[in-house]
Design a protein with these regions (language model features):
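Short amphipathic recognition helices of helix-turn-helix/homeodomain-type DNA-binding modules
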Residues: 1-10, 24-31, 35, 42-99, ...
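Short, cationic motifs built from Arg/Lys/His that form the positively charged side of catalytic pockets
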Residues: 9-12, 19
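Short, flexible helical or helix-coil boundary motifs
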Residues: 15, 69, 99-104, 394, ...
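Short glycine/serine/threonine/alanine-rich loop segments
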Residues: 17, 28, 57, 189, ...
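Acidic-residue sensor for enzyme active/binding pockets
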Residues: 20, 37
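Intrinsically disordered, low-complexity activation-like regions
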Residues: 105-109
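Conserved binding/catalytic microenvironments
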Residues: 111-115, 120, 124-429
Length: 429
């Protein structure tokens, strides 16, 4: 039997709404509001934030307004002069009735949820779409979508769900925090990125998801790498390996180890990690999302090229050129949604540096065409740093005698001066 929600009615009246005006504000029929108040229906999860705003309450307060009100348990009236054994029986009946009412209330509590299967599936689909679009679309097109969806999931987690639904929400929140980490990384806001990464780790722990734990360690390794803490970058990548659960995450972590080891000047460790990464690739994992959460072969070759070039030895220049060339070819041959603009530009910059190391200015200039003609909104923090490093390199006396490289130097300087994503100041995390 439905129980009238008196608290909901009182709150609606307290804020000045009639059933008709509340229905109009909610874009529903008046009878729908009537069913909510009579206990014969309950607002769907996606309607609750709007209803909470209309009633000027938060999500938890709305849950209490919508909770069924317990029916009063009729108490037995004792006879004027009860016998001791009769009073005992009455007390026992009352105790049993009270226990029954408490069980009924707990059933209502335990079965209440602010999500359903359809909503969870939609969240999964939205995260997959954003993860895929992140690698190929300009960052300004996605940053607000990522933030809004993440805030919505956090708000859902402040409500009540069944345990398996809460686990799924934590995993979704972790993935969205991972996307937020990459947004901050691409802007060069490393302290903010570290905060988002810690949030992602907390969510991975709450969801007890090894794949997400491993991915977060890879993101934290990236942050350390671009902060030039190469020892920490290598350590974090190594710390993620025990959580690698198949798919491409093992190759990602080993490739990160290779780059960090090369930056530290540890050639043998870098070469071992490059080879191990090639062996670790097993294809997409069972629960591996696309885009930013996967590690395509092209990206692996990009990392290998960077690592080989960082060894700063003529012995590895040929291999670095081959790796970067392979990465570019794989990206350019991939579907447009899989073409990571950042990794493509990184590959071209590495290739140009490798050709300069070999003394081939013409090939270096050709390699840089894609970078110099790219839109400034594609210049992430890592690309901007690589460009500045190249500009400094071309300014050294060893390249001063070449008219070809003199023109290239001016083009690179001009590219470095363009307004880009990284011109925004870093906020406090």
């Amino acid at each position: 039997m439905a129980t009238k929600r008196h608290a909901l009615i009182k709150r609606r009246e307290a804020v000045g709404h009639t059933q008709e005006t509340l229905a109009a504000a909610m874009d529903v029929d008046r009878t729908t509001v009537g069913r909510w108040e009579s206990g014969r229906a309950i607002p769907r999860p996606w309607m609750r934030p709007k209803l909470a705003r209309q009633l000027r309450v938060n999500a938890d307060q709305l849950d209490k307004l919508l909770a069924p009100e317990p029916s009063a348990v009729p108490s037995a009236v004792p006879p004027p002069h009860p016998k001791p054994e009769t009073s005992l029986r009455v007390s026992l009946v009352q105790a049993v009735a009270t226990d029954s009412a408490e069980s009924a209330l707990f059933i209502n509590f335990a079965s209440a949820t602010n999500v359903d299967t359809i909503l969870l599936e939609q969240l999964d689909a939205d995260v997959s779409r954003l993860a895929l679009e992140y690698v190929s679309k300009p960052l300004p097109d996605l940053v607000h979508q990522i933030g809004a969806l993440r805030s919505g999931v956090f708000e859902l987690l402040r409500g009540r769900q069944r345990p398996h639904q809460t686990i799924r929400l934590y995993l979704t929140a972790g993935r969205l925090s991972g996307l937020a980490t990459h947004v901050a990384l691409d802007l060069g806001h490393y302290a903010v990125a570290a905060t988002h990464a810690r949030t992602a780790w907390l969510c991975a722990e709450s969801a007890d998801h090894d794949g997400m734990r491993a991915w977060v360690r890879s993101a934290q390794s990236l942050i350390a790498y671009w902060q030039r803490d190469y020892a920490l970058a290598a350590h974090l990548a190594s710390a993620g390996m025990p959580f690698a659960d198949g798919g491409t995450i093992g190759a990602r972590l080993l490739s990160l180890q290779a780059r960090a080891a090369a930056a530290l000047g540890d050639g043998p460790a870098a070469l071992r990690a490059i080879e191990a990464a090639a062996d670790a690739r097993t294809g997409p994992g069972l629960n591996e999302l696309p885009g930013i959460f996967s590690f395509p072969e092209a990206k692996q070759w990009t990392y290998a090229g960077t690592a080989l070039l960082a060894l700063n030895s003529s012995s590895y220049v040929g291999r670095a050129i081959a790796a970067s060339t392979r990465a570019i070819a794989l990206y350019e041959g991939a579907p447009s949604l899989d073409q990571s603009s950042g990794d493509l530009l990184a590959g071209h910059l590495d290739l140009a540096n490798a050709y300069l190391a070999r003394g081939d200015g013409d090939a270096a200039q050709e390699s840089l065409t894609a970078v110099l003609t790219a839109s400034p909104d594609r210049y992430t923090a890592s690309i901007a740093r690589r460009l500045n490093t190249l500009s400094n390199r071309l300014s050294s006396p060893v390249y001063s005698g070449s008219s070809l490289l003199s023109g290239l130097r001016e083009n690179v300087r001009e590219a470095c001066s363009r307004p880009a994503l990284t011109t925004t100041p870093e906020p406090s995390p």
